[in-house]
């Protein structure tokens, strides 16, 4: 997904990939995707390396990032997407190998700073190793920031209705740490924990301790939804909240926070480039201080 997204931009060039898959299988997985469809471009393999849209991409299969020799490939930024090197100490091996910066594609497991577009991205001060947090945090944080900046959040609960992930079981299987998580993904709605809401307190310190949440894993292949139930400090009608969201989506958060009043469903957001889209028709208000936002 990172590769496909990069191909849509003119300011990013993929020059090297490290994966334990062989290049032929890597090419196959890039060409064909059950959720996002066929790759819009040419993909070949030559001498163990990928040739994508006519450009050679170095392929390696190193288990230890310190041995990757990124500098030889001209690598500037590494997207650390294995899920295995989520501390400064382990991710720094990429720097040792010649990369200039590392972006973890999931939440860090130590004090490595997290930055989220639409939340605290303006506080980035050139750190060489950062985390982009989780997909749920990226969806929730812009929404929570707009609400808090305009109306104040006294307290809030989040539920994410989350699409199936690769770590779930196709049928019931052993899962010693999370018994429910071991149940068949295609057969069940599975309650689960998530640290995404608490992580918002790290990227938006003013909300630390005011927000927590949970997840339901559901049998859909892609697109998840955040349901944010908020007690507001400053009374506001639902129309006023919609107006604030629309203004943010067209202003400071354009390209990060989207806004729609269409009668959409989850598949309408396959390939969505905004990290969060406010569904104006889906939310409700009990009164001017208690609202549910989607």
Curated annotation (Swiss-Prot):
EC numbers for this chain: 1.2.1.12
SUPFAM superfamilies on file: Glyceraldehyde-3-phosphate dehydrogenase-like, C-terminal domain, NAD(P)-binding Rossmann-fold domains
Binding site for NAD(+): 19, 63, 105
Binding site residues for D-glyceraldehyde 3-phosphate: 134-136, 165, 194-195, 217
Active site per the UniProt annotation: 135
GO BP annotations listed: glucose metabolic process; glycolytic process
This protein's UniProt keywords: Cytoplasm, Glycolysis, NAD, Nucleotide-binding, Oxidoreductase
Transmembrane helix among keywords: no
Predominant place of localization: cytoplasm
Enzyme class: oxidoreductase
GO molecular function terms noted in the UniProt entry: glyceraldehyde-3-phosphate dehydrogenase (NAD+) (phosphorylating) activity; NAD binding; NADP binding
Residues marked Activates thiol group during catalysis (site): 162
Classification via InterPro entries: GlycerAld/Erythrose_P_DH (IPR020831), GlycerAld_3-P_DH_AS (IPR020830), GlycerAld_3-P_DH_cat (IPR020829), GlycerAld_3-P_DH_NAD(P)-bd (IPR020828), Glyceraldehyde-3-P_DH_1 (IPR006424), NAD(P)-bd_dom_sf (IPR036291)
SMART domains for the chain: Gp_dh_N (SM00846)
GO terms for cellular component: cytoplasm
Pathway of action: Carbohydrate degradation; glycolysis; pyruvate from D-glyceraldehyde 3-phosphate: step 1/5
Subcellular locations according to the entry: Cytoplasm
Pfam families attached to this UniProt entry: Gp_dh_C, Gp_dh_N
Matches recorded under CDD domains: GAPDH_I_C, GAPDH_I_N
UniProt catalytic activity: D-glyceraldehyde 3-phosphate + phosphate + NAD(+) = (2R)-3-phospho-glyceroyl phosphate + NADH + H(+)
Signal sequence segment: none
Subunit and interaction comment: Homotetramer.
Functional description taken from the UniProt entry: Catalyzes the oxidative phosphorylation of glyceraldehyde 3-phosphate (G3P) to 1,3-bisphosphoglycerate (BPG) using the cofactor NAD. The first reaction step involves the formation of a hemiacetal intermediate between G3P and a cysteine residue, and this hemiacetal intermediate is then oxidized to a thioester, with concomitant reduction of NAD to NADH. The reduced NADH is then exchanged with the second NAD, and the thioester is attacked by a nucleophilic inorganic phosphate to produce BPG.
NCBIfam families: GAPDH-I
Family as reported in the entry's similarity comment: Belongs to the glyceraldehyde-3-phosphate dehydrogenase family.
This protein's name: Glyceraldehyde-3-phosphate dehydrogenase
Species: Shimwellia blattae
Gene, per the UniProt record: gap
